[in-house]
């Protein structure tokens, strides 16, 4: 998992609330056995509508999704995070996230930045008026900045210290485990040989 410190990218306004994981990626797209290739299923039902924001060329290459409250509700679905990442999103900004989605995001390297609802509304308005506007998210200072000059919007965002640490260090669950490799090896070296053990796959 790559380390996350700051990211600047085109912001895209998703003016919808209560977006659940089945809307993010329908279950029919969950049959792959890898973590890649899910971008085609992202918001699949909505993308059939030519007026849907992801179909607007003004937001081409967007990597910062600015969504309404209660984003990522519904069933726990890592694929929802993977679909967002496969599409190119590095950050989702919302006034409120479902706990499970926020947890899955942190483990996979997608930053879920929680800001006040009034901030989301201001960013939406700015992005609507100026498609292609860049949004900078700084994890070290926990700040979001959209636009430049007198029209710029800057605000702090909330993220728990543990998830922030994982993202800054680029640590997924396997990375955290490998950080204890010496202790694990030391334990295994003194473990009685008659006890059950796993073996390396060939």
Curated annotation (Swiss-Prot):
Known EC number: 4.2.1.33
Alphabetical GO biological process terms: L-leucine biosynthetic process
Highest taxon of the lineage: Bacteria
Gene Ontology molecular function: 3-isopropylmalate dehydratase activity
Pathway: Amino-acid biosynthesis; L-leucine biosynthesis; L-leucine from 3-methyl-2-oxobutanoate: step 2/4
Keyword set, alphabetical order: Amino-acid biosynthesis, Branched-chain amino acid biosynthesis, Leucine biosynthesis, Lyase
Enzyme class label: lyase
Catalytic activity: (2R,3S)-3-isopropylmalate = (2S)-2-isopropylmalate
Oligomer and partners: Heterodimer of LeuC and LeuD.
UniProt cross-references to HAMAP family, sorted A to Z: LeuD_type1
Family statement drawn from the similarity comment of this UniProt entry: Belongs to the LeuD family. LeuD type 1 subfamily.
Protein name in the entry: 3-isopropylmalate dehydratase small subunit
């Amino acid at each position: 998992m790559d380390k996350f410190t700051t990211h600047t990218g085109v912001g895209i306004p998703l003016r919808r609330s209560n977006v659940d994981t089945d809307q993010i990626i329908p279950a029919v797209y969950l049959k792959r056995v890898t973590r890649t290739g899910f971008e085609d299923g992202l918001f699949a039902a909505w993308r059939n509508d030519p007026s849907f924001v992801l179909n607007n060329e003004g937001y081409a290459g967007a990597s910062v999704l600015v969504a309404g409250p209660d984003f990522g509700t519904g069933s726990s679905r890592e694929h929802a995070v993977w679909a967002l990442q496969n599409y190119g999103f590095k950050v989702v900004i919302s006034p409120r996230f479902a706990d499970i989605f926020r947890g899955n995001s942190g483990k996979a390297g997608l930053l879920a930045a929680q800001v006040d609802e009034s901030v989301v509304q201001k960013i939406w308005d700015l992005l609507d008026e100026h498609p292609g506007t860049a949004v900078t998210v700084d994890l070290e200072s926990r700040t979001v900045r959209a636009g430049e000059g007198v029209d710029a919007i800057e605000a702090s965002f909330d993220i728990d210290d543990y998830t922030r640490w994982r993202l800054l260090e680029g640590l997924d669950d396997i990375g955290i485990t490998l950080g204890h490799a010496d202790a694990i090896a030391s334990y295994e070296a003194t473990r009685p040989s008659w006890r059950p053990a796993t073996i390396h796959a060939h």
